[in-house]
Structures are given as C-alpha cells and as structure tokens.
Amino acid sequence: MKLKQLSVSPDFKRKLMIATGVGAAVLAITAVVSPDRAWGNLFVVAYYLITLGLGGALFIALTTVCGAGWSTAFRRVPEAMTGLLPVAGVILLSVLALRLPQYGWHHHGTGDAGTFWFKEFWLQPSFLAARAVGYIVLWIAFARRLVRKSRTQDQQVDPCPAPSIRTSIVFLFVFAFTISLAGVDWIMALEPMWFSTMWGVYQFSGLIMGTLATIIISCIVLRRLGPLSEVFRDEHLHDLGKLLLGFSCFWMYIWFSQYMLIWYANIPEETSYFIPRTQGAWGPVLIGNIVLNWVIPFFVLLPRPCKRNE
C-alpha cells in the first residue's frame, strides 16, 4: 500500500485565506474595542495550540515506547501536529511580553504576598518569562527529534529502534514535569492566591483528550480526501475511539476529585476558584464543560458501532 499525496485545490486555498483574513480583522477590531479580552483570547488560543502540538509529540513517544505498531498507518498526523509548537509558542511569548500586567499579581510590590513568599519569588516577571522561553525551546527541540527519528523508522526493519525508545522515554519525563509547571505559570497564576495539587494532571487530561480528538478528525478527513484511504481502517478508528472514551472518563475522574476535595474541605484559598464559576452566567459554562468533555463522549462512544462509524 502506498500513501497518496494530498493536493489542495485553489478553491480551498482561497477559502482558507478568506477565513484567515476575517479572523485577523476580528482580532484587530477586538484589540481596539476591548484590548484585555483580545489579548486574553489570543493567549488561550496559543496555549491550546501548544497543547495540541505537545500532544502530537506525546502520542509519538508513547506509541514508540509501547511498541504500538498499529499507529504506523496514521503516524504522519501526530508528526504534523508538532508543527504547531513554533508558531503557537511565538504567539504565546509575544502575549506574555506585551500583556504580562494582565496578571493580577503583576501590580503588587515586594512583600505583598505575605506568607506566600515562594509564590512571590516564583512569579517574578523575569523568572516567569525565562521559564516560558525554556519550556517552549525544550518542547520544540524534543518534538523535532522525535519526528526525525519517527520518519527514519520508515526505512528500518525494527519499527521501534532503541535510540527512538530512549529519546521517547526522556521526553516523557521532561513532558510530565514541564507541562505541569507551565500550566501553573500560565493558567493557574491568573489567580495566584488559589492553589490545587491536582492542576497539573487536570491539564494533562485535557491535553490528551484534545490530541486524540484532533487525530481522529484529521484521519477521517484525510481518509475521505484520499491520502489515508488505503491504510486507515475502521480498526484504527475503533482503537482511537476507545482511547478517547477512556481518557474522557479519566478527565471526569480528575475534575470530580478536584471539585469534591475542595468542596468538602471548604478552605477559602481553594474555594475561591469554583465559587465564581458556579454562579451567574458562568454556571451554565461549567455544566457545559462537563457535558462536552464527558457526558456526550461517554454515551456516544460507548457502543462499539459508534467508535467505528466516522
């Protein structure tokens, strides 16, 4: 079986350029009307794209370490996803450089943190920026190395050679450590007096769910367009669907564990995160988050035929 190349039609390119222009225009208008919202939205988008790029590298590393040959047919998809890291990384670093004062703690002086002196030290603007650059450079370097080794496997008899396994193992440790710290630095630090020891694994569960969903959608589109029509089977779709179902339940488990422990302890430093998110207009958003990330995936993907039907 040979992989077919995807040819992009001029009409599709034109529509893509129009969509890009509209998005840029909306961003520019929002930046004038409501700068804080525009920069905040751009930051969230950049962070989400970074998690997808990291998820592609994570998928390559995990399948390499586990010797999962079944993913060879669509391995180019997670490889391509790692290409999001440089672009999204530049956007995120730009937002941090230009809009760091958007973080509430930025305006406070030295000593305002009181007993939380370590947070004051950890969130120093220069230290925060240095860590952000370090995370992104490290991720890009590992992602490129993983992709390069993944593509050289096409000419080798052994689908998972030892050098690729070693690189993947090192990346898994680096990934687990850095994604947890990045989640604290970039998202959790928006509310610096709030803390949760489960935030890192909560970020990971969302990352892996988004990655699997992106891989599934991309593979379905590429199978319909031709490049994966001869190699991507219903069995692959079934296996990816099982993974998505499993990690959807894992996400719900982590979400409930975090919420239940904070609700039961009823400590102000912890409840300050959930109280505004369960009241007013944010209440339906919280419910929608659960419905979209667990309720719908659970009941839709539970039957076997649904996992095999694109």
Which residue ranges define each predicted feature?
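Hydrophobic/aromatic residues in alpha-helical transmembrane segments
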Residues: L54-L58, G210, C249, I296
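N-terminal regions that are enriched for targeting/export leaders
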Residues: M1-G55, E120
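Juxtamembrane helix-break-helix junctions at the cytosolic face
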Residues: T64-W70, V300-E310
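Membrane-interface helix-loop junction between the first two transmembrane segments
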Residues: T30-F43, L62-S71, V221
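Transmembrane-helix bundle segments that line or gate the permeation/cavity pathway
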Residues: A46-Q155, F171
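Alpha-helical transmembrane segments of multipass membrane proteins
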Residues: A28-I29, A61, G183, F298
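Core segments of transmembrane alpha-helices
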Residues: V291-P297
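Long, contiguous internal "core" modules enriched in hydrophobic/ aromatic residues
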Residues: S7-L27, W122-N289, L302-C306
